[in-house]
Amino acid sequence: MIKLFNTLSKRIEVFKPIDDVVKIYCCGVTVYDLCHLGHARSYIAWDVLRRFLIYSDFKVKYVQNFTDIDDKILKRAKEESISMKEVSEKNIIEFHKDMDSLGIMRPDSMPRATNHICNICDLITILEDKGYAYSRDGDVYYSVFKNQNYGKLSNQNIEEQNINQQGRMANEENSKKLNPQDFALWKKAKDDEPFFDSPWGKGRPGWHIECSAMVKDELGDTIDIHLGGSDLIFPHHENEIAQSEAANGKKLANYWLHNGMVNVNGQKMSKSLKNFKTIRELINSGISPMTLRYFVMTVNYRKPLDFTEEALRSASEAWKNINVALSFMDLTKGSLNSIDKNEPIEEEYKEKISFELSQKKLKFSEALGNDLNTASAIAIIYDLAKPLKNFLNQFQRVEGFKIDQNEKFFLLENFKTLEKLTEVLGLKKEVLVKESKITEEEISTLINERLKAKKEKNYAKADEIRSLLKEKGIELIDQSKEITTWIRV
């Protein structure tokens, strides 16, 4: 049984699919820049959901869009003196690099807004015909007050909003609206902007209608699960519901799941606070992709994730132990990869081990089935890794170390279970780095020398110190010009 917290009902519900194939839509990125830690948090959570559904014998169709026309993309195109399409294409390539590095499965379909203009126009026309939309001088707006259910996802009170927003109709766009809360379905093109032809003239779609059109075209009128960050609940997802359900006359999604936001040292991650972390920066700073993935999964997907040096270091150490266990067959050089048929295993012992491992698999499924409790699932993974790592410590220390067939059976079955369950979490074996014997005091001394070299603009020496520490298994993370932290890898 899988239970999920449904933002729509505000409670945990047992998941019941509509039919044989679970239809999932996830709001994708606006492709104007590199992905950040918030994107990693979101897409890792939904990757675990997808993997767990497949592990639980569900068939899944997973769709995630690209928003490839937007004010931010147009702004970036002007800044770089390239076309909107070039900005989008470049960042879609970088998106795939980041997601692939984190072990995130590629969606079954990744539609782009610009390829769905006809569907978008058709949907807007239906809304006009049904009286939910109106046009004003080349723009088209959704009339929020025509929809009595508006606000059901976010608990927004549009009557109160209307009172609060009275007098804010000064700018040109708002002056065209019947009410301040009405939102754009189609925007009239400005002189210097790319455009698409439509029944209302040259222009481009609003952000919200893009997703409604792509959901309908890719998955149909009603889907099982709609995913996104909690920052999308209002207005984006609220507006999606309003558009789709008004046009189609059916419920858009049965389950709405939203992940929590990312903080850095207790503060909201933002460019203005200069604590903004891209996935690429974090990996280039020495944090391994699987360490990052493991770190994200240590906290329930609905809760805020606080990125701190201490939490990251703890995740790095924990993942290192699991990674060693996943390297079990490599480190034993295949010497334990089979059971000696001439020395049979006690049947009673085999049954005991098989039962114990089946119980761990059951608890693993119960953990993830309890609203994706990845922290509890990881605890089971760690429990499986522990005897493998303990054995390896003895095996590598004692020459000619031998074990009986019972223990060999236990270790091999434990390893197989570990491999299978880590795959559900998307954790994959990474190349092992020899552990360093350098002390924390020595590391601090070298970091201070490097900071001094950087202040003196002696970048060659600074790079030399970074390389020296890297050779000793220490990766430096530059938090700012004055602050450098480190992790063992």
From Swiss-Prot:
One of its GO terms (cellular component) is cytosol. It comes from the Bacteria. Binds 1 zinc ion per subunit. ATP binds at K271. Zn(2+) binds at C27, C211, H236, E240. CDD domains: CysRS_core. A motif ('HIGH' region) lies at residues 29-39. Its cofactor is Zn(2+). The keyword Metal-binding applies. It holds the Pfam family DALR_2. It catalyses: tRNA(Cys) + L-cysteine + ATP = L-cysteinyl-tRNA(Cys) + AMP + diphosphate. A motif ('KMSKS' region) lies at residues 268-272. It is an enzyme of class 6 (ligase). Keywords: Aminoacyl-tRNA synthetase, ATP-binding, Cytoplasm, Ligase, Metal-binding, Nucleotide-binding, Protein biosynthesis, Zinc. Its EC number is 6.1.1.16. One of its GO terms (biological process) is cysteinyl-tRNA aminoacylation. The keyword Nucleotide-binding applies. It is found in: Cytoplasm. Its main location: cytoplasm. InterPro entries: Cys-tRNA-ligase, Cys-tRNA-synt_Ia_DALR, Cys-tRNA/MSH_ligase, Rossmann-like_a/b/a_fold, tRNA-synt_1_cat_dom, tRNAsynth_Ia_anticodon-bd. Belongs to the class-I aminoacyl-tRNA synthetase family. Monomer. NCBIfam families: cysS (TIGR00435). This is Cysteine--tRNA ligase. It comes from Prochlorococcus marinus (strain MIT 9301). The gene is cysS.
